[in-house]
Every structure is written in C-alpha cells, then in structure tokens.
C-alpha cells in the first residue's frame, strides 16, 4: 500500500451506505470503521478515496449478507483536487470488497476507479476496466 499524492477529503462517515461495484455478491454495504483512522474521542471515523474500511453487507446474496468484510473506497461524490489542479468528482460513492492485504475478492469491477485508489492498491488497478 502506497501513499496518495493528493489530499483526499474524507467525505464518507461511519454509517454511510454505499454501493459495492464488484461481482462478489454484495450490493449495498455500510461503513463500520475506517482502517488507520486517527481521530478525537467520540468522533465518527471518516473515509475517502483509497481508504480501507470495515463494512457490513446490507443487501446482496444470502451468503454475503450480514458479513463483516474489508472494502476500499474507489469513488466518492465529494470533489477532490489533484496536484496538477484538476478537480475530480464522481456520480456515486462506491467500494470494492478486498481481503486484509488489499487484494480484491471479485474478478470484475463495474464503472471507473479513481487513479489514487489504483495507485495505492495495484491489484484493484489491474482488475478495474477504467481508471480515471
């Protein structure tokens, strides 16, 4: 896992329900916590693009529902600025289910993936069909 060059705003709080865009069987997940988040006492953990989260599967196949898994945020609606000055924003918030080492569990990712997430997790970059 590498560092991200641009400063990503952490726009997704714990409790946010997000679409899962891979073919693992999960459709909607809820963020429980964000890995390596360091905040103040009683502050809700927040995540942005490229952050690994602990999620609970809310909608999906019966085998996937009610499971606690790891996921990486690959898209967010809140815009962020890249070092070259371009501002990037996506139409939706999306995650990809991964294992504890950051390797995706699915074999296909629907829609675009942010370049920052693909650089931090190279296996997500190779699985993605489109990197923006």
Swiss-Prot record:
Part of the 50S ribosomal subunit. Forms a cluster with proteins L3 and L24e, part of which may contact the 16S rRNA in 2 intersubunit bridges. It comes from Methanococcoides burtonii (strain DSM 6242 / NBRC 107633 / OCM 468 / ACE-M). One of its GO terms (molecular function) is structural constituent of ribosome. Transmembrane segments: none annotated. InterPro entries: Ribosomal_uL14, Ribosomal_uL14_arc, Ribosomal_uL14_CS, Ribosomal_uL14_sf. This is Large ribosomal subunit protein uL14. NCBIfam families: PRK08571.1 (NF006344), uL14_arch (TIGR03673). Binds to 23S rRNA. Forms part of two intersubunit bridges in the 70S ribosome. GO terms for cellular component: cytosolic large ribosomal subunit.
